[in-house]
Regions:
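Long, highly hydrophobic alpha-helical transmembrane signal-anchor segments
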Residues: 1-38, 89-103
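Cytosolic juxtamembrane amphipathic/interface segments immediately preceding
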Residues: 16-24, 65-80
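Alpha-helical transmembrane segments and their helix-start/interface "positive-inside/aromatic belt" motifs
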Residues: 26-37, 79-86, 202-209
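Hydrophobic alpha-helical membrane-embedded segments
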Residues: 27-55
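Hydrophobic alpha-helical transmembrane segments of multi-pass integral membrane proteins
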Residues: 39, 80-98, 114, 118, ...
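Membrane-interface amphipathic/juxtamembrane segments adjacent to transmembrane helices
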Residues: 50-74
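Alpha-helical transmembrane segments with an aromatic anchor "belt"
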Residues: 100-164
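Terminal transmembrane helical module of multi-pass membrane proteins
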Residues: 155-226
Length: 226
């Protein structure tokens, strides 16, 4: 069908355009729903271990010595490692729900996993003759210990704010603040534990070696892949 216009002809189709399909929300995605249910079931099965590890972790928010004591107890340290691994996926789901990064869920999980493995590898390669092995393990595992607290806090933040229909931008800011405080606290605890065996200058060098490469790799991955 043609219609005259002063500057020419405009062709109009007789067929109506199909309406654009609405974008699938996070909760409507079946993969997210299945993973959330799986995480909930796993958390319910491991509630006893959560209660066991929570007691030694709470004092670590105020002091560094409980983190060292945690390394002396093999059963607690293994429980810590297992729970930190189990909480990794719920944390990624919470970050993905809030749109914390432009990365999709599984890519975000992969980037965070590689970042954690990079820090673990550096802690195993780096020489630490001035720092005892137990203190070194406590310092390098401080972030993984406190990650349990961060993950529970992040999941509760997303769950409660989501239930009250809080704007996603507000939830995102809340998660960023929690992650920033967690990262700062983990660095402070690492510094305190290492500084108990060596001076401030060596502590600073150790922190640079442990923290800068993983942080740089994480930032580069988000900027490049996002």
């Amino acid at each position: 069908m043609f219609q005259d216009f002063p500057n020419g002809l405009l062709w109009l189709s007789r067929e109506a355009l199909s309406p654009a399909s609405p974008e699938l929300s996070w909760t409507d995605n079946p993969v997210n729903g299945i993973l959330s249910v799986v995480c909930l079931l796993v958390a319910m099965c491991d509630i006893k271990d959560f209660l066991i590890i929570w007691k030694p972790l709470m004092p670590a928010l105020a002091r560094w010595k409980p983190l060292v004591s945690l390394e002396y107890n093999m059963q607690l340290s293994r429980t810590r490692n297992r729970l930190a691994g189990l909480l990794f996926l719920p944390f990624c789901l919470a970050a993905d729900w809030a749109g914390l990064t432009p990365l999709p869920l599984f890519l975000l999980a992969g980037v965070l996993a590689v970042t954690g493995l990079l820090k673990w590898a550096i802690s195993r390669i780096l020489s630490h003759k001035r720092v005892s092995q137990d203190n070194w393990n406590a310092a390098t595992n401080a972030a993984f210990s406190l990650f349990i607290v961060l993950s529970v806090t992040a999941v509760l933040t997303v769950g409660i704010m989501g239930a009250f229909k809080v704007v996603t931008d507000v939830v995102r800011i809340a998660l960023l603040v929690e992650i920033g405080l967690f990262w700062l606290l983990s660095i402070v605890r690492e510094a305190q534990i290492i500084n108990s065996n060596c001076g401030p200058f060596r502590t600073f060098l150790y922190l640079c070696a442990l923290e800068l490469p993983p942080c740089a790799a994480l930032a580069a991955a988000i900027l490049y892949l996002g």
